[in-house]
């Protein structure tokens, strides 16, 4: 899937887009101003991440300046062109501001996640917590969330309520993940045994909720009916789930030269992904379970990956991803067909096509 870059006009930062060039051309031809919207988002992100305190400004812009696909603002823009409403009634400024809100929250979670996971790098640079300490990384994430909340208040009570609920879901998903982690936890933490149900609970909160909100914002701010808003939100939820499923599959099945990711990275970090959980569900006392219970050195991880590649669990995970993509695309049926629906359909299908 080719990824064009935006035109760096008006001082905006060129970045890769998560849509093919031909789809982008159709969107622009039909007046769905993806480039203009994302240019506005980029400019307003810099404004909202600004602080009069020089050091706060430096840290808050650290990951922002490192780039990113702005996937969530893109979804806000596309979902904003779904409802059956006159083209000139689509609120450019409101959609751009909503894109800023979801991207600020996403950036904030990256600062926090890197502390939780003790990640060494993010977007090709040293993680903020290693460069400046855990405390400063956490506070910077909080600062960006505060800026997102401030902007949401300018768009109204509904927008503020939705992002507040989303933040709660993000936290619930992260807490559930910690409870189910394979690391040693204090006795005061109630441990949750790994299961597919627990995994889905984590992903729905930690990953899918903000993507769902991005699509909900777009349809809501463009005057969509209750039916349209909920359909857009469900589309976003399913897409968020599907992309996580495909990431899990790629961790096992991908060619490292193509994906840039060493197979079994999640396994080595103690993360039980969908294919792993399906395999353990089928054979809880088998060879894979024994490997996972041992010290996960490079040899054991390689052996586990080899077992998974030959296991029906991988095909089952692929089927789950495909079913979830189809569920997302089905939600688009309530909207009139156009460039936005076709783009969102292609985007959802990419969760499957990237698997090869």
Feature-to-residue mapping (PLM):
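All-alpha prenyltransferase/terpene-synthase fold signal
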Residues: 1-356
């Amino acid at each position: 899937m080719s990824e064009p870059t935006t035109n760096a006009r008006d001082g905006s930062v060129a970045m890769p887009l998560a849509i093919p060039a031909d789809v982008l051309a159709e969107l622009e031809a039909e007046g769905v101003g993806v480039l203009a919207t994302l240019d506005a988002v980029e400019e307003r992100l810099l404004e909202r991440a600004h602080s009069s305190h020089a050091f706060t400004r430096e840290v808050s812009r650290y990951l922002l300046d490192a780039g990113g696909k702005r996937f969530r603002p893109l979804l806000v823009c596309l979902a904003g062109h779904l409802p059956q409403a006159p083209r000139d009634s689509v609120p450019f400024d409101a959609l751009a501001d909503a894109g800023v809100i979801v991207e600020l929250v996403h950036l904030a979670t990256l600062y926090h996640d890197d502390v939780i996971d003790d990640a060494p790098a993010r977007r090709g640079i040293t993680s903020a917590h290693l460069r400046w300490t855990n405390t400063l990384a956490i506070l910077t994430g909080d600062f960006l969330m505060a800026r997102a909340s401030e902007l949401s208040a300018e768009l109204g009570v509904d927008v503020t309520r939705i992002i507040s609920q989303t933040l709660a879901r993000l936290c619930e998903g992260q807490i559930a993940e910690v409870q189910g982690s394979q690391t040693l936890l204090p006795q005061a933490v109630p441990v949750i045994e790994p299961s597919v149900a627990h995994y889905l609970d984590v992903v729905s909160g930690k990953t899918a909720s903000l993507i769902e909100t991005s699509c909900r914002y777009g349809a809501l701010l463009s005057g969509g009916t209750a039916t349209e808003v909920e359909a857009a939100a469900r589309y976003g939820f399913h897409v968020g789930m599907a992309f996580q499923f495909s990431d899990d599959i790629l961790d096992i099945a991908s060619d490292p030269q193509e994906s840039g990711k060493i197979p079994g990275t999640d396994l080595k970090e103690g993360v039980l992904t969908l294919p792993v959980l399906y395999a353990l569900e089928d054979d809880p006392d088998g060879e894979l379970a024994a490997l996972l219970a041992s010290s996960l050195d490079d040899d054991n991880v390689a052996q586990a990956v080899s077992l998974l590649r030959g296991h029906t669990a991988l095909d089952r995970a692929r089927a789950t991803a495909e079913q979830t993509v189809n569920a997302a695309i089905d939600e688009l049926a309530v909207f009139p067909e156009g460039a936005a629906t076709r783009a969102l359909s292609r985007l959802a299908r990419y969760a499957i096509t990237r698997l090869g």
